[in-house]
Regions:
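Conserved RNA-binding domains used in RNP assembly and mRNA/RNA metabolism
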Residues: 1-68
Length: 68
């Protein structure tokens, strides 16, 4: 089950889907999260590492939940 995560600061190392307008645009493992917690870098299962910014309306949906 996927869980939408609004606070990205705890997502490092998690398996996620990045969505935009309800569609999955990327899936992979979060490598890094910015200090402000609004930008993350994901290593997709296919392709090269990409950055996503919450301010651009991207959503993070966790496959593996972040540690609490």
């Amino acid at each position: 089950m996927l869980t939408r995560i609004d606070n990205w600061s705890s997502l490092s190392g998690c398996q996620i889907q990045v969505r935009l307008n309800g569609r999955t645009v990327c899936s992979g493992i979060v490598g890094e999260v910015s200090a402000c917690g609004t930008v993350l870098w994901i290593q997709p299962f296919t392709g090269v590492r990409r950055a996503f910014d919450q301010h651009d309306s991207y959503e993070a949906w966790a496959v593996s939940a972040p540690a609490r």
